[in-house]
UniProtKB/Swiss-Prot annotation:
Residues 1-14 have a biased composition (Low complexity). Residues 27-37 have a biased composition (Polar residues). InterPro entries: F-box-like_dom_sf, F-box/kelch-repeat_ARATH, F-box_dom, Kelch-typ_b-propeller, Kelch_1. The keyword Repeat applies. It comes from Arabidopsis thaliana (Mouse-ear cress). This is F-box/kelch-repeat protein At4g39590. SUPFAM superfamilies: F-box domain (SSF81383), Kelch motif (SSF117281).
Length: 402
């Protein structure tokens, strides 16, 4: 082979084609997506989301838009809460003011404008019924029942010339609307009312001339009907007509406890009355602020919380409770309410400015060592301010499941 000349080498180099270069792939520019607004979600998805949120936030949600308000006030949301097992105990307060023919109703809600406990009582619609004095309030499920009392001339709010009533009014705590319920067989005022296994037992508050076989009536919310229970005859019959019997009741452990001239207990399963041997034990709770939480009876008296240990038939002091105000033990009275495994405590305090401050504490309960219960103060704060003429002592506090 002959050697290639420099000129030929140069020509060959110039004629040689470079290998094709790989083209760089263009990097796609990032796609900017608009954030999804919760308001753009369909109603059924919003309802499912809101049903999982505590009912205490519903007033704040209802202020966002008319659409949100429509969802959180719909019957469907409470049906969904029940299916999702998201029902909760909500606290209600009924206040009465001197020389005022109206009752004032409040429920505890979350307040986004507060920075401590973020909870406050908000007023809800009151019934458009004539004022009923000496009535009883009791809650079953999502309803609050106002039973009996006196009706008459509204210009005489102290109760003169007023007649006892068999009327029953029902507050639906899901919609905050009132309706009439089935009337009792007898007119009553200043009776005592307790709940046992979902049924309402109304005792006393009748005239001596009334049928004694109807002295105790029992209402079944499922069948919306009234029945009677055998009269245990625990009060003396006086010659004069007397409405205000010294009869008190407590529903506990599936039984109805009554105190009158003696202490008795009624077992609905057996359908009979028995004497209470340790009557003074139950008497402590009946005469004081009390409530039942997870089938355990609690009461408060003279600054001390106690619970009833049914295993040893003895009252024991509730331990812990650090965080309550220093002067709490000096309160004359307070209200105890079941909050579904926890306990709400309400008390009031008068200020020199002429204002009555209503406080609330939420206490979680824990069993320790088998025979002790400890309470932990989750929070406490002022939840309502009213005029000094109002007193929590004459108020009613209770909870409903919604």
């Amino acid at each position: 082979m002959f050697p290639m000349s420099s000129t030929s080498r140069s020509s060959a180099a110039n004629n040689r084609k470079d290998p094709p270069r790989k083209k760089n792939k263009e990097t796609p520019s990032p796609v900017t997506r608009e954030p999804t607004s919760i308001d753009s979600l369909p109603n059924d998805l919003l309802l499912n989301c809101f049903a999982r949120v505590s009912r205490m936030y519903y007033p704040a949600l209802s202020r966002v838009s008319k659409r949100f308000r429509s969802i959180v006030t719909s019957p469907e949301i409470y049906n969904t809460r029940s299916l999702l097992n998201r029902t909760e105990k909500c606290l209600y307060l009924c206040l009465r003011f001197p020389f005022d023919n109206n009752t004032h109703w409040f429920t505890l809600y979350q307040n986004p404008n507060r920075t401590v406990s973020d909870k406050v009582f908000l007023q809800i619609p009151s019934p458009q019924y004539p004022l009923t004095l000496s009535s009883n309030l009791v809650a079953v499920g999502s309803n609050i029942y106002r039973i009996g009392g006196t009706v008459g001339d509204d210009s005489c709010p102290l109760g003169f010339d007023r007649e006892p009533s068999s009327k029953v009014s029902i507050l639906d705590c899901r919609s905050h609307t009132w309706r009439d319920g089935p009337r009792m067989r007898l007119n009553r005022r200043s009776s005592t009312t307790s709940v046992v296994d979902g049924k309402i037992y109304v005792t006393g508050g009748t005239e001596d001339t009334d049928n004694p076989s109807h002295w105790i009536e029992v209402f079944d919310p499922k069948t919306q009907s009234w029945g009677t229970v055998t009269n245990p005859h625990i009060v003396k019959v006086w010659e004069e007509v007397c409405y205000r019997r010294a009869v008190k009741s407590i529903g506990h452990d599936g039984k109805l406890y009554l105190s009158g001239d003696k202490y008795v207990v009624y077992d609905p399963d057996e359908g009979k009355w028995n004497s209470v041997e340790e009557h003074w034990l139950i008497g402590y709770a009946i005469g004081s602020s009390n409530c039942v939480v997870d089938n355990i009876l609690f009461y408060w008296d003279q600054g001390v919380f106690k619970w009833y240990d049914s295993k040893v038939s003895s009252w024991k002091q509730l331990k812990g409770l650090e965080g309550l105000p220093d002067d709490f033990s000096q309160r004359e009275y307070c209200k105890l309410v079941d909050l579904g495994g926890k306990m709400a405590v309400l008390w009031d305090k008068w200020e020199y400015s002429g204002v009555c401050m209503i406080f609330c504490a939420e206490i979680s309960l824990e069993k320790r060592d088998g025979d002790e219960i400890w309470g932990k103060v989750e929070w406490f704060d002022t939840v309502l301010e009213v005029g000094a003429s109002c007193s929590l002592k004459s108020a009613d506090a209770l909870s409903a499941s919604v």
